[in-house]
């Protein structure tokens, strides 16, 4: 049985929540192009991002620990893949568009320079007389200008909603870049923002314990971590390597569940009935 694009769009309309961004309602691309016979617009965007040079380069960019510190620690690439997993889990539970969510999640860190947030801060200082440096703006520049894959235009010619999701990406440590876009973006984009913070919380704890920068005893000072440990029968003062993995897994599951429930509650309270 084949599922052509038209049927995929119908399935979205039938199965997704009223407030989900449907691919059939996209605001389109800057440059008109033929539609794929078996992929929706957001599926095409996701695939294009995966095949970029910028995406492959994430493997060698620092998350917290530099690449040479060991192959256990996260890089921008592994962090991105974790954000994709968290984002899709939340999007699926809320009835949002997983393809759009995944495309935004895959591209949300493409503009980061090497050496983590310190590298970005120093680069911003060096570029102050030339407009500064901001990684969301750089991600847009990569996807709309620097990646050259098509003879008729520069960039990947992604849909409006994916580019909007990158421009409006915002976390406590990284403000959004919104000169071309208004509002908070789609709910799918907001889920990626939330998932970014969730992935950070879980893997920074994991990497911190693994490296010795955090001691198991320090975790006992955090009440909900004590509760999570108690549920699994873990002693935070004598945390084994297996215990660390169990704790991180529990933390990740807890945050995903709480984020999903809180988002659903807010959507219901606000009476959101459309994208």
PLM features per residue range, with description:
Residues 100-129, 135-136:
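Aspartate-rich (DDxxD/NDxxD/DxxxD) Mg2+/diphosphate-binding motifs
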């Amino acid at each position: 049985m084949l599922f052509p694009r038209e049927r995929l769009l119908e399935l979205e309309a039938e199965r997704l929540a009223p407030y989900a961004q449907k691919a059939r309602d996209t605001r389109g691309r800057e440059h008109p192009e033929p539609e794929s016979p078996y992929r929706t617009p957001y599926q095409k965007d996701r695939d294009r991002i995966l095949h970029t040079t910028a995406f492959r380069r994430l493997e060698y960019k620092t998350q917290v620990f530099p690449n040479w510190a060991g192959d256990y620690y996260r890089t921008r690439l592994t962090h991105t893949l974790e954000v994709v997993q968290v984002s899709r889990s939340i999007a699926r539970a809320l009835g949002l568009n997983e393809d759009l969510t995944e495309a935004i999640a895959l591209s949300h860190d493409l503009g980061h320079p090497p050496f983590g947030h310190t590298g970005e801060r120093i680069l911003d200082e060096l570029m102050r007389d030339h407009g500064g440096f901001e990684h969301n703006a750089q991600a847009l520049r990569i996807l709309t200008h620097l990646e050259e894959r098509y003879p008729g235009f520069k960039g990947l010619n992604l849909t409006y909603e994916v580019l909007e999701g990158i421009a409006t990406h915002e976390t406590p440590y990284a403000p959004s870049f919104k000169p071309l876009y208004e509002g908070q973006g789609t709910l799918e984009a907001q889920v990626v923002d939330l998932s970014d913070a969730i992935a950070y919380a879980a893997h920074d704890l994991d990497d911190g314990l693994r490296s010795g920068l955090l001691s198991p005893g320090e975790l006992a000072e955090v009440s909900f971590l004590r509760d999570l440990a108690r549920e699994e029968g873990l002693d935070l003062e004598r945390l084994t390597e297996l215990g660390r993995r169990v704790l991180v897994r529990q933390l990740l599951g807890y945050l995903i569940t709480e984020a999903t429930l809180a988002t659903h509650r807010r959507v219901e309270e606000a009476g959101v009935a459309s994208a």
